[in-house]
Amino acid sequence: MPGETITLQVGQCGNQVGLQYWQQLATEHGIQSDGSSTPYPKDINDLQLQELNNSGSSPQSYPQQTKPNGKYRNDHPELFFTLSDSNTYTPRSILIDMEPSVIAKSTSALPMFNPRNVHLSNQGNGAANNWINGYKYGTEEEETLLNLIDREVDKCDNLSNFQLFHSVAGGTGSGVGSKMLEVISDRYGHKKLLNTFSIFPSNEDTSDVVVQPYNTILTLKRLIDYSDATFVFHNDSLNRIENILFNNNSNIQHDDNDLFLGANKLIALVSASVSNPLRFPGYMYSSMESIVSNLIPTPDLKFLTSSIAPFSTQKHNYLNEYDMLLELSNDRYKTNRVGGDTSYISMLNYLIGYNLDQREIRKGILKSQQRISFVPWVARSVLVVHGKKSPYLKNTNLEGIQVTNNTSMIDVFTKILKQFDLLIKRKAYLNRYYSSVEEENEVMEMFNESRESVKSIIDEYKACKEITYLDDDDEDDLEDGDGGGGGNGNGYNNIDDADMGI
């Protein structure tokens, strides 16, 4: 049986996205805002029940739950929620912030959150968009925060992984988030997977947070050191996707708040969809680790890009499997800006729907392989997983997301490094990060180490574009692992026929 996932949502951005994420999971599993369970809809399509009941999981694999009609239900919310004796669900989530307003809105919108899992600063004045303030606060509250985590771990029968929602550019999400990465890694080591859903700042040279490059580079150092997989979401790209949505729906009236909320929903939908094969199980993946291992061939190449379609527009209502695969590979739908010279290391497509047409999928895989450039040391594998659609969702149209590992990270990190260098060269705003000569030396050392770490990842992604990438001392270690990016070299066998229901 797949293990449970514990979620940490840290800072304003992390908690705003976290709220959308839990609302999405609750909707997919028929859980109301107070944690009570909704019966299966009376008009549920027989095809939906058949798809779920034929998902391939055995009675020994999962604790089965009974439907109102006496049949077993094959969704598994217990991987992300605890179920109380009174049959109410509570997210396996810890909410952390240094000011109360966002968490107050979250707990009001979703009373199912466990109030004992909420941690707020007594001062309530935030981190002032400063990584150091957030990191120091996390250090001071380390024991309290670890107690929250340990208590949630004790509720798990088979903990599989932790996941973190946060921003890399502010104060709390970056600073406290960085500290959480350190303490979880120190406490649980590599026994448990540690994934992050990290929101990156705008690529524009100007920002409301003038110290944004400092915060970002300090956070990246911790992501490089401690995360097992980081899903990158870029504000620029999210806003571009939302603009496409609104432009395709001329009747929708919108403002900047709509774009902001829509961006959070996109992140939440991708994050929820990644775990679809676990929550609505099939044959292909039995754990988050098995999913991640298909995407990350070496520990350093762990920054992932995603794309999503459709967006509830008329244009996308009639996409078949072939069209969906091609749309997912369209750069304009990616949550991180991808240029024309990008090379792919791995690609995993989720097609979520019913009775998928294997012929259309094979055509889509072959066409994608023709269009996409892969690094030379991997097979041109375009992996496809058939995701089961929740019977609680009224929309029965085919949906899809794509997760890839690719060299667009070179441009992302180079831009961050350039912005950092411009500030540090002028020693701009450095006085915000220390108050004494001793602190200054310590902070400058952290900056130097962080810069070197980011530069090393840029070099790693550049090196992976060469055929000689694996010709080093670590080649034997890689061959012993379960890394992705390999596959079998042809698209046909990248579909699991049993999981496709064919």
From Swiss-Prot:
CDD domains: gamma_tubulin. SMART domains: Tubulin (SM00864). It comes from the Eukaryota. Gene3D superfamilies: Helix hairpin bin, Tubulin/FtsZ, GTPase domain. GTP binds at residues 169-175. The keyword GTP-binding applies. InterPro entries: Gamma_tubulin, Tub_FtsZ_C, Tubulin, Tubulin/FtsZ_2-layer-sand-dom, Tubulin/FtsZ_GTPase_sf, Tubulin_C, Tubulin_CS, Tubulin_FtsZ_GTPase. Disulfide bonds: none annotated. Tubulin is the major constituent of microtubules. The gamma chain is found at microtubule organizing centers (MTOC) such as the spindle poles or the centrosome, suggesting that it is involved in the minus-end nucleation of microtubule assembly. Belongs to the tubulin family. This is Tubulin gamma chain. It comes from Candida albicans.
